[in-house]
Regions:
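Interdomain boundary/hinge segments at the C-termini of tandem beta-sandwich modules
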Residues: 3-9, 88-94, 173-179
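Proline-enriched interdomain boundary motifs that mark the N-terminal boundary
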Residues: 9-18, 94-103, 179-187
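Short, exposed coil/turn segments at beta-strand boundaries within extracellular/luminal domains
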Residues: 22, 77-85, 107, 163-170, ...
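A short beta-strand segment in extracellular, disulfide-stabilized domains
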Residues: 25-34, 110-119, 195-202
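Solvent-exposed loop segments of extracellular immunoglobulin-like
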Residues: 35-41, 120-126
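Low-complexity "stalk/linker" and mucin-like segments enriched in Ser/Thr/Pro/Ala/Gly
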Residues: 41-55, 108, 129-140
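Solvent-exposed segments in extracellular or luminal domains encompassing
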Residues: 56-67, 141-152
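Hydrophobic/tyrosine-rich beta-strand signature of extracellular beta-sandwich/beta-rich modules
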Residues: 72-74, 157-159
Protein backbone atom coordinates (compact mmCIF):
# COMPACT_ATOMS: atom_id res chain seq x y z
CA UNK A 1 0.00 0.00 0.00
CA UNK A 2 1.03 3.54 -0.50
CA UNK A 3 2.54 5.34 2.44
CA UNK A 4 1.29 8.87 2.04
CA UNK A 5 3.62 11.72 2.80
CA UNK A 6 2.48 15.30 3.11
CA UNK A 7 4.97 17.72 1.63
CA UNK A 8 4.46 21.07 3.31
CA UNK A 9 5.44 24.24 1.48
CA UNK A 10 8.39 26.32 2.51
CA UNK A 11 8.13 30.00 3.37
CA UNK A 12 9.62 32.44 0.87
CA UNK A 13 11.27 35.25 2.83
CA UNK A 14 12.49 38.24 0.81
CA UNK A 15 14.30 41.09 2.55
CA UNK A 16 13.51 44.64 1.44
CA UNK A 17 15.39 47.75 2.55
CA UNK A 18 18.40 49.94 1.82
CA UNK A 19 21.53 48.17 0.60
CA UNK A 20 23.65 51.33 0.86
CA UNK A 21 23.64 53.50 3.99
CA UNK A 22 25.88 55.95 5.79
CA UNK A 23 28.15 54.93 8.64
CA UNK A 24 26.32 55.06 11.98
CA UNK A 25 22.98 55.66 10.25
CA UNK A 26 20.05 54.96 12.57
CA UNK A 27 16.38 54.18 11.98
CA UNK A 28 16.88 52.07 8.84
CA UNK A 29 13.97 49.67 8.30
CA UNK A 30 14.11 46.19 6.75
CA UNK A 31 11.04 44.07 6.12
CA UNK A 32 9.70 40.87 4.65
CA UNK A 33 6.00 40.23 3.89
CA UNK A 34 4.09 39.41 7.07
CA UNK A 35 2.38 36.02 7.00
CA UNK A 36 0.12 34.88 9.84
CA UNK A 37 1.44 31.85 11.70
CA UNK A 38 5.03 32.48 10.67
CA UNK A 39 7.92 33.45 12.93
CA UNK A 40 10.90 35.62 12.03
CA UNK A 41 14.44 35.50 13.36
CA UNK A 42 16.90 38.11 12.08
CA UNK A 43 20.70 38.07 12.23
CA UNK A 44 22.90 41.10 11.61
CA UNK A 45 26.60 41.93 11.33
CA UNK A 46 28.03 45.43 11.35
CA UNK A 47 25.05 46.96 13.10
CA UNK A 48 22.39 46.46 15.76
CA UNK A 49 18.67 45.72 15.68
CA UNK A 50 17.01 48.47 17.71
CA UNK A 51 13.38 47.57 17.15
CA UNK A 52 11.10 44.85 15.80
CA UNK A 53 13.20 41.79 16.64
CA UNK A 54 11.03 38.70 16.20
CA UNK A 55 8.70 40.42 13.75
CA UNK A 56 8.66 40.79 9.98
CA UNK A 57 9.98 44.38 10.21
CA UNK A 58 13.10 45.50 12.04
CA UNK A 59 14.78 48.83 12.68
CA UNK A 60 18.57 48.93 12.45
CA UNK A 61 21.35 51.25 13.52
CA UNK A 62 24.40 50.59 11.38
CA UNK A 63 27.97 50.86 12.67
CA UNK A 64 31.19 52.22 11.24
CA UNK A 65 31.96 52.31 7.53
CA UNK A 66 32.45 48.99 5.80
CA UNK A 67 30.32 45.97 4.98
CA UNK A 68 27.23 44.80 6.83
CA UNK A 69 24.86 41.87 6.38
CA UNK A 70 21.35 40.82 7.26
CA UNK A 71 19.93 37.33 7.24
CA UNK A 72 16.39 36.17 8.01
CA UNK A 73 15.04 32.78 9.01
CA UNK A 74 11.29 32.49 8.47
CA UNK A 75 9.48 29.49 9.97
CA UNK A 76 5.94 28.19 9.50
CA UNK A 77 4.95 27.48 13.08
CA UNK A 78 2.45 24.71 12.31
CA UNK A 79 4.89 22.63 10.27
CA UNK A 80 8.30 23.92 11.45
CA UNK A 81 9.30 24.26 7.81
CA UNK A 82 11.89 27.04 7.62
CA UNK A 83 13.99 28.92 5.12
CA UNK A 84 17.03 31.09 5.81
CA UNK A 85 17.73 33.77 3.24
CA UNK A 86 21.07 34.33 1.62
CA UNK A 87 23.05 37.20 3.10
CA UNK A 88 21.56 40.61 2.31
CA UNK A 89 24.66 42.74 1.84
CA UNK A 90 24.69 46.37 2.95
CA UNK A 91 27.42 48.90 2.15
CA UNK A 92 28.07 51.38 4.95
CA UNK A 93 29.51 54.44 3.23
CA UNK A 94 31.89 56.70 5.16
CA UNK A 95 30.83 60.11 6.40
CA UNK A 96 32.96 63.17 5.61
CA UNK A 97 35.13 64.62 8.39
CA UNK A 98 35.08 68.41 8.05
CA UNK A 99 37.40 70.47 10.26
CA UNK A 100 37.07 74.26 10.24
CA UNK A 101 40.20 76.42 10.17
CA UNK A 102 40.18 80.19 10.66
CA UNK A 103 40.65 82.94 13.25
CA UNK A 104 38.95 82.26 16.58
CA UNK A 105 39.47 85.84 17.80
CA UNK A 106 38.57 88.87 15.68
CA UNK A 107 37.69 92.52 16.07
CA UNK A 108 34.20 93.92 15.71
CA UNK A 109 33.35 94.72 12.09
CA UNK A 110 36.37 92.80 10.81
CA UNK A 111 36.09 92.08 7.10
CA UNK A 112 37.89 89.52 4.98
CA UNK A 113 38.31 86.79 7.60
CA UNK A 114 38.64 83.41 5.87
CA UNK A 115 37.28 80.11 7.20
CA UNK A 116 37.93 76.89 5.34
CA UNK A 117 38.06 73.11 5.37
CA UNK A 118 40.02 70.71 3.17
CA UNK A 119 38.49 70.57 -0.30
CA UNK A 120 37.35 67.10 -1.36
CA UNK A 121 36.32 66.68 -4.99
CA UNK A 122 32.73 65.50 -5.19
CA UNK A 123 31.72 66.89 -1.80
CA UNK A 124 29.43 69.87 -1.24
CA UNK A 125 29.67 72.50 1.49
CA UNK A 126 26.98 74.45 3.32
CA UNK A 127 28.07 77.10 5.84
CA UNK A 128 26.14 78.88 8.57
CA UNK A 129 27.54 81.96 10.30
CA UNK A 130 26.11 83.54 13.43
CA UNK A 131 27.08 87.09 14.32
CA UNK A 132 28.47 87.85 10.90
CA UNK A 133 27.85 87.66 7.17
CA UNK A 134 29.33 85.43 4.48
CA UNK A 135 30.59 87.78 1.78
CA UNK A 136 32.24 85.25 -0.55
CA UNK A 137 32.64 81.53 -1.11
CA UNK A 138 29.21 80.27 -0.04
CA UNK A 139 28.84 76.70 -1.29
CA UNK A 140 32.60 76.13 -1.48
CA UNK A 141 35.14 74.82 1.01
CA UNK A 142 36.36 78.35 1.84
CA UNK A 143 34.30 81.37 2.88
CA UNK A 144 35.05 85.01 3.62
CA UNK A 145 33.23 86.59 6.56
CA UNK A 146 32.52 90.11 7.76
CA UNK A 147 31.83 90.11 11.48
CA UNK A 148 29.30 92.25 13.30
CA UNK A 149 29.61 94.12 16.57
CA UNK A 150 28.43 91.45 19.02
CA UNK A 151 30.61 89.78 21.61
CA UNK A 152 30.70 86.38 19.91
CA UNK A 153 30.03 84.57 16.67
CA UNK A 154 29.83 81.03 15.35
CA UNK A 155 30.74 79.19 12.17
CA UNK A 156 29.22 75.82 11.29
CA UNK A 157 29.75 73.61 8.26
CA UNK A 158 27.79 70.70 6.82
CA UNK A 159 29.83 68.67 4.34
CA UNK A 160 28.04 66.15 2.12
CA UNK A 161 29.39 63.39 -0.11
CA UNK A 162 27.33 64.05 -3.22
CA UNK A 163 27.50 60.47 -4.54
CA UNK A 164 26.11 58.88 -1.37
CA UNK A 165 24.30 61.69 0.44
CA UNK A 166 26.32 60.99 3.58
CA UNK A 167 26.80 64.20 5.54
CA UNK A 168 28.45 65.52 8.68
CA UNK A 169 27.70 68.79 10.46
CA UNK A 170 30.49 70.23 12.59
CA UNK A 171 29.95 71.53 16.07
CA UNK A 172 29.88 75.31 16.30
CA UNK A 173 33.29 76.90 15.74
CA UNK A 174 33.17 79.67 18.33
CA UNK A 175 34.62 83.08 17.50
CA UNK A 176 35.30 85.81 20.06
CA UNK A 177 34.52 89.27 18.67
CA UNK A 178 36.50 91.87 20.57
CA UNK A 179 35.13 95.42 20.72
CA UNK A 180 36.87 98.25 18.91
CA UNK A 181 38.27 101.21 20.84
CA UNK A 182 36.30 104.44 20.58
CA UNK A 183 38.82 107.28 20.26
CA UNK A 184 37.43 110.80 20.55
CA UNK A 185 39.78 113.73 19.95
CA UNK A 186 39.36 116.77 22.16
CA UNK A 187 41.10 120.08 21.63
CA UNK A 188 40.93 123.40 19.82
CA UNK A 189 39.53 123.30 16.30
CA UNK A 190 40.58 126.87 15.54
CA UNK A 191 44.06 128.19 16.25
CA UNK A 192 46.34 131.03 15.22
CA UNK A 193 49.02 130.67 12.61
CA UNK A 194 52.26 129.45 14.17
CA UNK A 195 50.53 128.84 17.54
CA UNK A 196 52.59 126.47 19.71
CA UNK A 197 51.74 124.27 22.67
CA UNK A 198 48.26 123.33 21.54
CA UNK A 199 47.16 120.13 23.28
CA UNK A 200 44.89 117.42 21.89
CA UNK A 201 43.74 114.43 23.91
CA UNK A 202 41.56 111.35 23.80
Amino acid sequence: TNYNVTINPLPTPVISGLNAVCANQAGVIYTTPNVGGHTYVWAITGGAITGGAGTNSITVTWGTAGAGTLQLTETITATTCAVTTAFYNVTKNPNPTPVISGPATVCASDAGDVYSTVNVVGNSYSWTVGGGTITAGAGTNSITVTWGSGASGTVQLTETVTATGCATATANYNVTINPLPTPVISGLNAVCANQAGVIYTT
